[in-house]
């Protein structure tokens, strides 16, 4: 009887260790304090999607005090837009730091959508080391349909 109790206790401890080790990391979403409404929207949309996927996340205005091992996603608009088309974005990842740089606020939104799609498809935070994308046509989604029907 005592042996059976020890086996149950050992199994319980092993299960707790496995579950504790499987905890998803906290994700810090960092954006400038003076971020535009579109960048704020992108950050909130990303935060909700991460939480829906089981991650805890927090929105910050800088990386001060963050541990270098914490996962961080930085959202920003490009200061120099020469390399990006309108509504374009670049995602770059080094270690635990992923930066989404949009040519404009819409580019940041589309970059965050790319991250959200990645989390949904791959169930992880291993984002591409480098990805740049921009639309062929600036108008996307429902706007194109509206233009077709209002002409």
Give the ranges of each region predicted by the language model.
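Bacterial N-terminal signal peptides that target proteins for export
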Residues: 2-11
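Short hydrophobic beta-strand segments
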Residues: 24-39, 70-76
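N-terminal segment of the mature soluble domain
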Residues: 43-62
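Short, well-ordered secondary-structure micro-motifs within conserved domains or adaptor modules
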Residues: 58-84
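Feature activates predominantly on carbohydrate-active enzymes
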Residues: 26, 34, 42-45, 49, ...
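C-terminal motif of bacterial Sec signal peptides marking the signal peptidase cleavage site
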Residues: 20-21
């Amino acid at each position: 009887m005592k042996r059976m109790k020890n086996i149950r206790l050992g199994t319980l401890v092993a299960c707790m260790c496995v579950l504790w080790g499987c905890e998803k990391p906290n994700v810090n979403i960092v954006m400038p304090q003076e971020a535009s409404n579109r960048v704020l929207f992108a950050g909130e949309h990303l935060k909700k999607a991460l939480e829906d996927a089981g991650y805890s996340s927090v929105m910050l205005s800088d990386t001060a005090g963050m541990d270098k091992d914490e996962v961080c996603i930085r959202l920003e608009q490009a200061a120099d837009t020469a390399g990006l088309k309108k509504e374009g974005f670049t995602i770059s990842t080094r270690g635990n730091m992923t930066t989404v740089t949009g040519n404009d606020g819409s580019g940041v939104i589309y970059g965050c959508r790319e991250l959200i799609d990645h989390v949904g498809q791959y169930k992880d935070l291993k984002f591409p080391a480098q990805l740049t994308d921009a639309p062929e046509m600036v108008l996307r989604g429902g706007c194109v349909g509206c233009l077709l029907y209002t002409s």
